[in-house]
Structures are given as structure tokens and as C-alpha cells.
Amino acid sequence: WIMGHMVNAIAQIDEFVNLGANSIETDVSFDSSANPEYTYHGVPCDCGRTCTKWEHFNEFLKGLRKATTPGDSKYHEKLVLVVFDLKTGSLYDNQASDAGKKLAKSLLQNYWNNGNNGGRAYIVLSIPNLAHYKLITGFKEALTSEGHPELMDKVGYDFSGNDDIGDVANAYKKAGVTGHVWQSDGITNCLLRGLDRVRKAVANRDSSSGYINKVHYWTVDKRQSTRDALDAGVDGIMTNYPDVIADVLNESAYKAKFRIASYDDNPWETFKN
């Protein structure tokens, strides 16, 4: 999965997919009542990027729905996965469940079109704080009470705080999560970070007792760091330059081992060689 980083304006969806992304990451900020409010990152952000592009969250969802609904004039067949980077740092810990419920209702109405031929992309809820695990249970409760528990089939999870792998496993246990797990690891492109924890995550993914289904690394903008991440065995790379990742995937060393995921590749299934 080539994951376009910080896609917060509707116009950027086309831009990143046209550069080669089959997945996008979008920031979600919350108001003081735990309603998802804007797709907005803010300052500071990655080096070389404008930090302040934004939409109202529900409007972004409508644009995203068009981009992922077959038959729509804005449809992109290859856009198959969306990561919502949930900026829950502005919330109290006890608001996490509410944030999940409100997020689910927004998605149900504006993205999934109340279960009637909505957008088809798989969704990853990426949460920065392990203490906010109730966002997951709240999200699930809301979809169930709204009569659409089947949409949970399209939803996966990530804790993005670079926490100890064992602590992450524990948070999922508390949230009752037993699958659909992406594990992110990384740092802003302004700084360097080694691949030690990525290797631990990959080892967990590939062990019979692991909880991780997919591992992605962020934010990778250079060819050599792309090669290093692929050599470590990641499933996804988040980038400001999808074309760079696509170029490396075309190199003879990687062409035989990797390909760009399509809609038929289940993002919740661990890839077995």
C-alpha cells in the first residue's frame, strides 16, 4: 500500500492518487464536545509540506465517498484504503468513547451513505494514545445501534504512538479487538528513525501468536529509505511523494517480491509467502 500522507483537502485526493497512491491518510481534529470537526493537521507538519489545508470533516467524507464509489465521475478504482489519523490529543480520556460514536455516525451518514451504495474503501482508525482505546468500542457500539454492524468488516485499527508492542497488544485486548490490526511506526520526515521497532512489528506479524496483520512505516520520501523499509518487510509505506515509492517498487530487486495492492487484497489478512 502506497499511502499518501496528510491528504486533508478534497482536491488532494486526485493529486495523490494520480501520483501513484492507492491509499491516503487524512487528519481528523475534534471539537471540545468530541465531534469530528475538520480534516486538518496544522503547524508544524512534515518538511516541504503546507500544513494548513483543510475541509469540514463531513464535506471531506462526501468527496471521499465520490472518489471511492464505482460509477461516480470522481471514482478512482485504485484508491482502496483510507487511514484516519485521529487527533484525539485535544480530548479528555473520558471522551474517547463519545468521539468513536460521533465518528461512526459521521462516516455512516456521509461516507457509507447509510449503508446504501456508499464508498467502498477500507478504513483504518489510527489512534495516537493507548488510553483512548474506548474510541474503538464506541465506534462499534454506534454502528451496531444504527443497524449497520456489517460495516465493521471494512474497519481496521492502528495505535500510532510508537508504544511498546506488548502495551499495544494489551490496549487491543481491552478494546476487544482480535483482528484488522495495522501497526504503524515512524516519525516526521524532518527527522531520522531506525527500523528496530518496525522489525519487531514485522516479527509479531509473522509469528503464530502475533496480533498484527499489517505493518506500515511513515513518513518516507527518499528512495534509499524506501528500499530499507521494503527490505524490513513492511506492507505499507506512508509518503509525501507516492511517485518515489512507485519508482522503487518498479526496480528489479522489488518487482518480483512486491506489487501494489488492489481492492481484492484484503488489508486485514496477514500476507503469507
Curated annotation (Swiss-Prot):
Catalytic activity: an N-(acyl)-sphingosylphosphocholine = an N-(acyl)-sphingosyl-1,3-cyclic phosphate + choline; an N-(acyl)-sphingosylphosphoethanolamine = an N-(acyl)-sphingosyl-1,3-cyclic phosphate + ethanolamine; a 1-acyl-sn-glycero-3-phosphocholine = a 1-acyl-sn-glycero-2,3-cyclic phosphate + choline; a 1-acyl-sn-glycero-3-phosphoethanolamine = a 1-acyl-sn-glycero-2,3-cyclic phosphate + ethanolamine
Tissue specificity as recorded in UniProt: Expressed by the venom gland.
Residues with glycosylation annotation: N250
Compartments, as annotated in UniProt: Secreted
Keyword Secreted listed: yes
Domain of life of the native organism: Eukaryota
Enzyme Commission (EC) number: 4.6.1.-
Active site as annotated: H5, H41 (nucleophile)
Annotated Gene Ontology cellular component terms: extracellular region
GO term, biological process aspect, one: killing of cells of another organism
Key words of the record: Cytolysis, Dermonecrotic toxin, Disulfide bond, Glycoprotein, Hemolysis, Lipid degradation, Lipid metabolism, Lyase, Magnesium, Metal-binding, Secreted, Toxin
The protein, known as: Dermonecrotic toxin LapSicTox-alphaIB1aii
Protein species of origin: Loxosceles apachea (Apache recluse spider)
